[in-house]
Amino acid sequence: MARVKGGVVSRKRRKRVLKLAKGYYGAKHILFRTAKEQVMNSYYYAYRDRRQKKRDFRKLWITRINAAARMNGLSYSQLMHGLKLAEIEVNRKMLADLAVNDAAAFTALADAAKAKLGK
């Protein structure tokens, strides 16, 4: 039986890793070993940051809502509590969008929250 050296398979594996490392800085897109390490790290960062992105956007929305709420004489927590008492269910993403793009609608919601809080 003939000896199989596996050159084709090895080259394909290395080529696949180097293709994934395209655009990386320095040796990380040229040398197989460093490229492989960087690709593995990249997968880790991608997995981690897909979850982090959700947290980051929620923080951004809360910051925007808080800024708009303070313009209407309420804190973020007072606004959210007032909206809950008024039985107005608007998620933070939509509230932040209203705060940025439709100040009049946000003010109407803030006034409804104030009324329920007794302010």
From Swiss-Prot:
Keywords: Ribonucleoprotein, Ribosomal protein, RNA-binding, rRNA-binding. PROSITE patterns: RIBOSOMAL_L20. It comes from the Bacteria. The keyword rRNA-binding applies. It holds the Pfam family Ribosomal_L20. GO terms for molecular function: rRNA binding; structural constituent of ribosome. SUPFAM superfamilies: Ribosomal protein L20. Transmembrane segments: none annotated. One of its GO terms (biological process) is translation. One of its GO terms (cellular component) is ribonucleoprotein complex. InterPro entries: Ribosomal_bL20, RIBOSOMAL_L20_CS, Ribosomal_protein_bL20_C. Binds directly to 23S ribosomal RNA and is necessary for the in vitro assembly process of the 50S ribosomal subunit. It is not involved in the protein synthesizing functions of that subunit. Belongs to the bacterial ribosomal protein bL20 family. This is Large ribosomal subunit protein bL20. It comes from Streptococcus agalactiae serotype V (strain ATCC BAA-611 / 2603 V/R). The lineage of its organism: Bacteria, Bacillati, Bacillota, Bacilli, Lactobacillales.
